[in-house]
């Protein structure tokens, strides 16, 4: 047990501790911070527009790496610049999942979707897509789950969360996560309480940069924004290199004038969905849609989100699903519960096998 606890402590205090950047309003962001943040990514992929099967184009190997990262390509080995059947199949599935016209070609709408900031969790696992995009027989339900439908045990309806201590987050930032947890608590029987102990908490949240020990390195601003594990592992990692905007929680959806700032609550609500067992959805208005444009704020659960989470846990017994059941904050300390951490360390080893993210 001592060895395991030491491993946990080493993980949190040696993997690229970072002071993430938070802004309370757009005007406080230095102008140079948000100039052409996605230009490099677009320039990298825009030259691929219009190419089709049978061609060999410089840069297609990077696109294949992107598709492999998110589960659309399952083959191993080096990626080539050949537009082959494997790539065409990946494009077809991607277009279907994101409600694009299925052409198997790299049209501009597909490429523009690819360069949008997004969640780092894959859309397909073991080559199987659960997003249901474009399926005729299931037109209203597009939510998905992790393989095997993992969920928190029925006996555990009071979950605790803690923040990685090296981030030194302010109370203002922590309140953003409290609001995000509340949105899921309002429609389920789950309750969420903040703890000060990462060893005692069910869920641990941290901001990291680049490679941070779980095999899923972050790529800098405006790429992958965050990733989270399925239950009951309970890890939520966010990219500390993003320009995170902290709103006051009064506006549920808006488009900000600066398109390279990322709304923290929007990402937090999405990743908590993963922590509770939801996969990605092909409903663009749903919280669990994989991508979010820079400057967008989306925090209200859609019908698809609510139906998905209630499929796992049922509704809120204290209301009709829309009542207020705020997450609680406490000063819990101590504790040496490590059962969850065994699952975490096994998960980290599994995740690190072959997944990596292209930098563009």
From Swiss-Prot:
A lipid is attached at residue 337 (GPI-anchor amidated serine). The keyword Membrane applies. Optimum pH is 7-8. The lineage of its organism: Eukaryota, Viridiplantae, Streptophyta, Embryophyta, Tracheophyta. The gene is 5MMP. This is Metalloendoproteinase 5-MMP. GO terms for molecular function: metalloendopeptidase activity; zinc ion binding. Mostly expressed in leaves, roots and stems, and, to a lower extent, in flowers. Its cofactor is Zn(2+). Repressed by acetohydroxamic acid (AHA). The conserved cysteine present in the cysteine-switch motif binds the catalytic zinc ion, thus inhibiting the enzyme. The dissociation of the cysteine from the zinc ion upon the activation-peptide release activates the enzyme. Residues 312-336 are annotated as: Disordered. It comes from the Eukaryota. Residues 21-142, 338-360 form a propeptide. GO terms for cellular component: extracellular matrix; plasma membrane; side of membrane. Optimum temperature is 35 degrees Celsius. It is a lipid-anchor; GPI-anchor. It is found in: Cell membrane. Keywords: Cell membrane, Glycoprotein, GPI-anchor, Hydrolase, Lipoprotein, Membrane, Metal-binding, Metalloprotease, Protease, Signal, Zinc, Zymogen. A motif (Cysteine switch) lies at residues 117-124. The keyword Transmembrane helix does not apply. It comes from Arabidopsis thaliana.
